Design a protein with these regions (language model features):
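N-terminal export signals
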Residues: 5-22
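Flexible "cap/lid" subdomain of the alpha/beta-hydrolase fold that forms the substrate-access gate
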Residues: 23-28, 39-40, 52, 88-126, ...
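Catalytic histidine-centered segment of alpha/beta-hydrolase-like enzymes
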Residues: 301-309
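A short loop-to-beta-strand scaffold at the N-terminal edge of the catalytic core in hydrolase folds
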Residues: 36-44
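C-terminal alpha-helix
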Residues: 316-324
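Residue-level recognition of beta-strand->loop/alpha-helix junctions
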Residues: 84, 297-299
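Conserved HGGG/HGGXW glycine-rich cap/lid loop of the alpha/beta-hydrolase fold
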Residues: 45-93
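Short acidic-hydrophobic surface loop/beta-edge motif
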Residues: 29-35
């Protein structure tokens, strides 16, 4: 299987900026890799022979959230790969018939498929929000492919069967956008006002982060992907059982319904100022991490942990890769 993966990685089509230009600008290379369902755009930095680190963004964010995390990893000799999730940036579906699903199994399968396309037997995984969900899924279901895991916001695998249980009213209030997306008005609102709506979520979820308009706009361009709205709407409906999933992914969803533990060395980062996934002093998810595990609370940091706390994020990755987990 791995020999096949290596061949796929070598054969994978890539649209790449000239190396000399990339060195002059200091920008990561933008490449593309084909899987069975997607052409995944991703940014790559560091030596091709370095241990790979895949860094996965969330909703509504994009690879810019890792701009200050990547340099210390590259300086330490690691190969940093930052994909655009399905529905974001230059990532595209290969076939019109493929369901525009944002369900958790799709995100996990996309990450695994990307590793196969790049010929990576294993990698360190980093993620938050949707990207943390993808990373947690691969770590839980295919631990042999994962060297270590840094997950912001905790054990990100959804408990879909438990979604019918109401949360405390204050938390229900924080999840207003999810219930909005359950309606056709919400779909229309996201389509018509995607930048304004996503900027509001940034502000609500990271109340202590004083980002400027230019910072937001650098990421907001990724939301103009033609499949962004459909992928987002399906994601937030599926997790409550209000939309069917992709039949091709049902076997993965059944495995995830069992709440599989994560056995690989892991560090969870949680912002104490997160306006949507509120942090508690008690670690209610520790039992879901059965390998070497730490949880770190970061004062004043909101939901976008890697962009708001890049030093802490990079330090956690380096600690695990150097055997400190």
């Amino acid at each position: 299987m791995l020999d096949r993966c290596l061949l796929l990685g070598l054969a994978s089509a890539a649209a790449i900026a000239p190396p000399a230009l990339a060195q002059q600008t200091g920008k990561p290379l933008l490449k593309r890799a084909s899987t069975s369902t997607l052409e995944i755009a991703y940014e790559e930095s560091g030596p091709a022979t370095g241990v790979p680190v895949l860094l996965m963004h969330g909703f509504p964010y994009d690879p810019r959230c890792y701009d200050e995390v990547v340099p210390p990893l590259v300086a330490a000799g690691y190969r940093a790969i930052v994909p655009y999730l399905r529905g974001y940036g230059e990532t595209r579906f290969l076939a019109a018939s493929t369901p525009r699903s944002g369900q958790q199994a799709a995100l996990g399968q996309d990450l695994l498929d990307l590793m196969d396309a790049l010929g990576l037997p294993n990698a360190a995984l980093v993620g938050f929000d949707w990207g943390g969900r993808a990373a947690c899924i691969v770590a839980a279901l295919w631990p042999e492919r994962v060297r270590c895991l840094v997950s912001a916001n905790g054990y990100n695998i959804q408990d879909i069967a438990g979604s019918v249980r109401p949360a405390p009213p204050e938390q229900e209030h924080r999840l207003w956008y999810q219930y909005y997306f359950h309606t056709e008005r919400g779909r229309a609102g996201l389509a018509a006002n995607r930048h304004a709506l996503c900027k509001l979520l940034w502000q609500l979820w990271s109340p202590n982060w004083r980002f400027d308009d230019a910072t937001f706009e650098r990421s907001a361009a990724s939301f103009d992907n033609p499949d962004f709205v459909e992928v987002v709407i399906q994601s937030y409906r599926h997790r409550y059982g209000y939309a069917p999933g992709d039949p091709a992914l049902e076997a993965i969803e059944q495995r995830l319904a069992a709440r599989p533990p994560i056995t690989v060395p892991s560090i969870v980062l949680q912002g104490e100022g997160d306006g949507v996934a509120t942090a508690t002093r008690a670690d209610t998810q520790a039992h879901l991490f059965t390998g070497p595990y730490q949880r770190r609370l970061i004062p004043r940091i909101g939901h976008d942990v890697p962009q708001e706390a890049p030093q802490e994020t990079a330090a956690a990755v380096l600690e695990l890769l150097r055997g400190g987990g």
